[in-house]
Amino acid sequence: MTYNPGRRDSFKKMILGGAALGSLASLDFKQNPSLTLKGNINHGVCAWSMRPLSLEQLCAQIKSVGVGAIDLISPANWDLLKKYDIHCSMCNGAEISIADGFNETNFHAQLEKNYLELIPLVQKAGYKNVIAFSGNRRGMDDETGLKNCEIGIKKILSLAEKHGVILTMELLNSRVDHKDYMCDKSAWGIELCKRIASENFKLLFDIYHMQIDEGDIIRTIRNNHQYFGHYHTAGNPGRNDLDENQEINYPPIMQAIVDSGFNGYVSHEFIPKGENKIAALGHAVQVCDV
């Protein structure tokens, strides 16, 4: 997940620009009623990466390419998703920012307030996953960050458990896109999961980010899938299409996810290089259809 300006700000601009792009949907993609997928992967998409399509344009088109959910949507836009019978596969709105997260205790009071307000809304809307971030290191060592994250997350964990909501911390690379981010290695995130020891706290395993920071994707999934509650895709390098110009071999990775018994969502978070965003999304779905 990479965004500049902030993903939330970019998404607001995308929504506001929707009316001006009203005719784009009909130009971008013709529905394919004959599309047949194996159905082993539940596909989602991150709306910010498909701009300039508005959220409504995205909702109206994604089912035609086998996508039934959208990530990183806040309560203000849930009704729009429901209008098109699109699931919110990862809710947001409680986080402060990627840089300001649970690893710093001075953010705990605000985070606790935000998540305690959001969690009941997520359950009421019929959703399950809520995004969370570790925050940046700012000179902090791994152990201090783990202890602080455990303290902060446990303040909201009982409410998440009560409402059947899963707090999902994203693994992001710190080499290229998110310099200084603390939860940048799967081992660190897995250790946090072990300390929290709840089925209501998981990791968002972003395949693109972990390819950059550590590689060994399939082995990591096979050995640690019980800690992963959600997945993201994108091509590397460049964070673009899942095509032959990038290095990640997605079909066997998807097979490892299927073999693990995972029944959550794999959401595509790449920035299409071409103008036809929906066609690029459809191609990604077919690449990952195992």
Where are these regions (language model features)?
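Active-site-adjacent beta->alpha loops and helix N-cap segments on the catalytic face
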Residues: W78-K82
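Catalytic domains of carbohydrate-active enzymes, especially glycoside hydrolases
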Residues: L58-N77
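Active-site acidic/histidine proton-transfer and metal-coordination neighborhood
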Residues: M14-L16, S23-S26, L37, E104-K202, ...
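Histidine-acidic metal/acid-base catalytic patches
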Residues: T2-N42, A47-K63, G126-N129, C183-F205, ...
